[in-house]
Amino acid sequence: MKTCFIDSKDSHHFVHSFPCVLAIGFFDGVHRGHQKVIQTAVKIAQEKNLKVGVMTFSPHPREVIGKEKVERLSTFSQKEALIREFGVDYLYVVAFNRNVQRLPPELFVKDYILRLQAKHVVVGFDFTYGAFGKGNVHRLREDGGYSFDVTVIDKIEHSKLKVSSTFIRKSLGEGKLERVTSCLGYHYKTIGFLHYIDESKLVFNNHQNMLPKSGEYEAIVKYGDYSFHTNIYCENFLNNVYVSHFHFFPVPSKEEPIEIQWLHRISANTLQPFEPFIVNL
């Protein structure tokens, strides 16, 4: 998969694009609903003998439109890796700024979708685009001058509630990891890096992933070639995660990412009766 960063409507990536089936969305967490969109695009591309493209945005549109910080379910590298697993040929990352925000819907389609040579577009049922979100799935084909087909993916539900990144963030905030895992289709993961060492405590820093509700969790901790299954203690309000049993492994370097796979919540306890391995996320 080739990742292409498009920072303006004059990007050279438009010149070097290929006719494709294009899946569009922010895809934070690449949850089951997102997976259905991408899988459908891949299937259609195979049937039509076309390339598969995925268009996403950076930063999150809400951070530009509403100037609000959106807690991420996945870092960009995590999202990129998850999308790559579906056999996508091109990941197009559009720099979402005020100029993109203000584009009328038909101009967004012309300047981005058509210039990427989309022959078929796949989106979720609630996809919107263009200034004030006026563009929607009902007018997408018309805005493209009927030059591409459109497939709209209906909502995926969990216990009769729509699976969405917002719903997953809410579930994380409630510590409902089983629900999170069901909606994602995999165990939620966060990434941290070594910040400093204090006696037997290792402190890690990361501000890109959302932490679940404070409490005790069963988890798998990975770094380098090492992996261990343990209980961890999360203090959400301090952005701290305490992990035990690290002393059997070498201390990771400051450049080495520490991955935590969150399996399930054990209790509301955040007290650590041991010398902890601390990850500040």
Set out the residue ranges of the language-model regions.
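Phosphate/ribose-recognition catalytic cores of enzymes acting on nucleotide-derived substrates
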Residues: 196-281
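Residues at the starts of beta-strands that form the adenosine-phosphate
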Residues: 49-53, 90, 120, 149
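Residue-level signal for inorganic ion chemistry
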Residues: 31, 83, 121, 180, ...
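Short acidic-hydrophobic, aromatic-tinged amphipathic segments that line or gate anion-handling sites
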Residues: 2-12, 92
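N-terminal catalytic cores of NTP/NDP-binding nucleotidyl/phosphoryl-transfer enzymes
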Residues: 12-75
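Classical nucleotidyltransferase
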Residues: 102-205, 269-281
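Glycine-rich, highly charged phosphate/nucleotide-binding loops
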Residues: 70-79, 103-108
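A glycine-rich helix N-cap at a beta->alpha junction
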Residues: 78-92
